[in-house]
Design a protein with these regions (language model features):
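Short, glycine-biased loop/turn motifs at secondary-structure junctions and
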Residues: 1-106
Length: 106
């Protein structure tokens, strides 16, 4: 599943070190907001979790995604996640426009 992820400036998130182009794997039980590898289906939602001045933003491929979803944004939790490309804020905005177009069938 295509999704979007924020990390800190060192490409870490909740103790997990990510490497561009490599697949991160979580071995435990998944729990949204508590355990697993997290990202957002809707690009702009990433800003709810990672402030622009201290973060990096990526397009990711998530596998082993739980059916669990939050009520306040499009956050997902997965067993495997690969950072495909660093896109920054301009990439998030562009991806958000494409996301909306897809949702409305444009």
């Amino acid at each position: 599943m295509k999704a979007y992820k924020g990390t800190d400036k060192d490409m870490k998130c909740r103790g997990m070190q990510y490497v561009l182009g490599e697949t991160a794997v979580y071995d435990g039980e998944l729990s949204l907001c508590h355990a697993g590898l997290h990202a957002c289906e809707q690009p702009i939602d990433v800003l709810n979790h990672y402030a622009p001045c201290e973060s990096r933003y990526f397009e990711v491929e998530a596998d082993g995604v739980s059916d669990e979803r939050g009520s306040d944004d499009s956050k997902i939790v997965a067993k495997k996640m690969m950072l495909k490309a660093e896109i920054g804020i301009p990439g998030l905005v562009k991806a958000q426009v494409e996301y909306i177009k897809k949702q409305i069938g444009f």
